[in-house]
Amino acid sequence: MNKHLRQICMGLSLLLLLGSKLNLFAQYASGGSPLSLSLVERTQSLRSLRHDDTLHLDAPSKATLSEWLQKDKQQTNELRPFHFAVPIATQIRLGQGQWTQTPNGEHIYRLTIKASGAKSIGLHCSRYIMPEGASLYLYGSQGTLRGAFTAQNNSESHTLSFSPLPGDWVTLEINLPAGISPNQVDLQIDKVYYGYKSFLDLKSTNNSARASAVGEPLYNYLETGLERLSCAPNIVAYPEYSNQARATLLLIAEGAYSSTGVLINNTRQDGTAYVLTAAHNINRIYDEDFISETPNDPKTIEKVREVCKSIIFFFGFESPSKDQDIRGSEEKTLSGATLIAYDEEHDMALLEITGLPTNAQGIRSIPASYNPYWAGWNISREPQGPFFGIHHALSSTKRICIAEDQKIHLYDYSINKGYEYLNRDISWKQAHWRIEEWRLGTTETGASGSPLFDGNGLVIGALTGGQSNCNNPYRDHYYALTQAWGGEHDTRDNIFKLAPWLNPDNQAVSKLSGYDPYSSKPVQRLSPFYGEKTQGLMKSYQAQEGVSGQGRIITLSHDTDVLGAYIQLGRFSLSQAEKPNYLIELSPIEGGLASSTPIWSTRLNNYNFIRYNRKTGEMKEEERTIGEDEVEVFIPSLANEKIPAGSYLLSIRTTDDSKLDYPLLTTQYRNTQKDYQQSTWAKSIGSTWSKSNTLGRSLWIDLLIQGDKQNGNGTPNIPNPEQYSAYYYGGQLYIQNPQGEATAQVYDLIGQRYTEVKLTEGENIIPTNSLLPRQIYILSIKGTLGSYSIKFRP
């Protein structure tokens, strides 16, 4: 299988269907549910909405589908998209549906689009303009709901794509509050994407429900993805690279191509949402049916511009645990981009995100809850290492790879061999940096466009391709910024250069530091668990009779804005209809008791992402795949609120005071049972909150805040237990021995001992570069405080 280009072509994986009465946040949607679903049940005047107009579309001919299926068979598995849908050109207007007015003056519009035999239906809006207060929802034949899409989804291009819904029909519903006229809505659908393959085409033989929905990050691609990335650590294990990690994004184009990009700074440092990636991520991997024989042909560029409108950008898709794979939050997404710069001669592409919501000051910007960072850059021809890369290989959670080289060189690079579908020579002369060997980690398919950083954390290139993997971590090629930079600004060919955009005022600089828009008012995740070693400590919550809620005490040392909350879900197989609504609340502690009136609250009843529908060209909200993986969900604040300093109970409870019976992930503090009793609280059914003497574990709920830096991680002032800790980095073992005597020993997996060191109190650093050949080892520590061990690989 050819593995040069590091982009993954996403297929229609197993879609775990959630229920229809679920609010859906994703891309940037405000949640809620369609007005008709609630009003139909309680008012006779809207019964006609059950019989809304249906638009029947002709399915593609058998010859057309046969042609696509035959083409699929001829494509390579690694470099070509998994085609699951074909577009049907349409001219759907609002006049083809039905408007109804409620007794309260609200307007409801519904139109059902049906394509017999389709495995999925997707939409693309060539015109999308929603007035303030309007909400648009989509729901399908299998109970899937997306929305609400609102005026915040309006963009300068006035287009929007919605990811496909399973089944052969989809209903579009628009809700307008009283006082808003239907004439203020402008909606036109020019493409419907007819899914001709079902999720069974990629379903593995063991019938696991771990695959992803169409257009969703694959996470564990074909159930081997996590294993293939076993040598590439979760980025949270390396907090020293947190800024660069904040800048690195997962991209999904046309609902089918998954890759990586990086938010990149410009010399005006104005927060322009530029994203650097690889050209082949947005030109269908130099497909002869897409690109012209002439490089950078204007016709190709126009096609690429259309692809950019379909891109979904995922922020912060990463595991919150160092050692355990948890499917990261998918709720922080933005959709749509415009093409800024593009050059096939270097495989370079620069995009600008267009689907930005409007903040409280009326400015379109990336939300603070996404915690963005704009990476700096270095166009020197002699950058200094050590070099490292951050990526979303295999469309999975964010990973890191590190090389120890101090210098790097330019090489020729070609991808022609084994690519029968190319219509011209695809090679580059002295355009690519080459990483000879990754000392830690690897890239993989899906890492295309990911940034390569120098020793100062500045971007020097983006990944084009290579053949590295965990067993062969060698020779990856990144196009060099210095080669793709371009000379003097010239409006005639600025699209082929980076310089006019990243250095718009033509300043005499070759390096630029990163940009943190929230450095004076940082975004902070309050958590005693985030990034900690939690392997073996996490398990699903065991429901307790008579308990309707659980929480833990947090302390805020300064006034702060609450942006939202994270919660970790364990594995489960309940249908969405069986999942009750939950409230996440922050309640003041007064006189040792939790106030019955929370100061802040948000609702957990949905988990969504945004997807592009190739048939319709629209963006749609999709319910996340929830099932066989531990999953992190981000629940945004309905409105940012200022919270004063003090002690609070951060809790989750059922809305109807029924038993808390849900596979929420729990973990334990590294403290004593007495400390559990001080920090873990429970709510009894029909009663109030009180300290728990029996639970012994805490639900993993974290608060996301913005403001002055908090002292600590929000945990109450309870002494942490004395225990050993250790990690491996850069050829050295770093070991903390809080007190007493201790000995560290290193073994291989067959029990052969390589070294033994007596530890002093405090930090101990043990070099291992010349000591250990490359393989997996066990560090074992024994001493006054007991025993401790970790696995590591030099």
Residue ranges and their predicted role:
Residues 23-25, 575-588, 716-794:
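C-terminal outer-membrane/trafficking sorting elements
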Residues 130-144, 581-588:
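Short, surface-exposed beta-strand/strand-loop-strand elements in extracellular ectodomains
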Residues 289-305, 323-334, 341-343, 453-525:
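C-terminal subregion of chymotrypsin/trypsin-like serine protease catalytic domains
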Residues 262-272, 441-463:
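Catalytic nucleophile loop of clan PA
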Residues 440-441, 449, 575-673:
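Aromatic- and Gly/Pro-enriched, solvent-exposed loop/edge beta-strand patches characteristic
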Residues 515-591, 647, 654-710:
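Beta-sheet-rich sandwich/jelly-roll-like modules and their strand-loop junctions
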Residues 165-436:
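Serine endopeptidase catalytic core focused on the charge-relay Asp
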Residues 27-108, 157-163, 168-265, 515-546, ...:
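Protease-domain processing segments flanking chymotrypsin-fold serine proteases, especially trypsin-like
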